[in-house]
């Protein structure tokens, strides 16, 4: 028999798995709605239990009701914490993806092209909820405005200095033509290049290129 908090615990498990992934899994729309609905139902139960007392409830005179109220209150509080933890984890992952230079359309394509089972659970064609897509775009705009103050510095670049100035890379998916210090390169799938690492770090982070060796 399901107990209060079981659905919230599932959200926490999803959040824990998300922390170990390089992408963002589908948003659990139905599960979030179910947890929210449980909180509202518990709140209605609390109001119904307290209604006969008209604001004069004394826990010491009705310990059974007091116990029920305590369980309901703690269950609501736990569910809210689970909801906050789930959404905070996804928000942190979204911000990480923005700093890595990922595109919101790439995120939307992860589900359509990959995890069909998870797509059925979320009932949407994107890994993100509409609110997350909006947050992603707005956060990206803020980051662009922030970076614009220091045009000579790539604030989203790696904090570790490269060990090799030039590296061999393989193109995993078409990325079109890019401009480097030594000229233009047309990145077509399965082709290989010997390039300056600083010119392609972002493309490696985005999954377009694979560093060889």
UniProtKB/Swiss-Prot annotation:
Pfam families named in the record: PSF1_C (PF24997), Sld5 (PF05916)
Source domain of life is Eukaryota
List UniProt keywords, sorted A-Z: DNA replication, Nucleus
List, alphabetically, the InterPro entries matched.
GINS_A (IPR021151), GINS_bundle-like_dom_sf (IPR036224), GINS_Psf1 (IPR005339), PSF1_C (IPR056783)
Q: Where in the cell is it found?
A: Nucleus
Instruction: Give the quaternary structure.
Output: Component of the GINS complex which is a heterotetramer of SLD5, PSF1, PSF2 and PSF3.
Q: What is this protein called?
A: DNA replication complex GINS protein PSF1
Q: Which organism is it from?
A: Chaetomium globosum (strain ATCC 6205 / CBS 148.51 / DSM 1962 / NBRC 6347 / NRRL 1970) (Soil fungus)
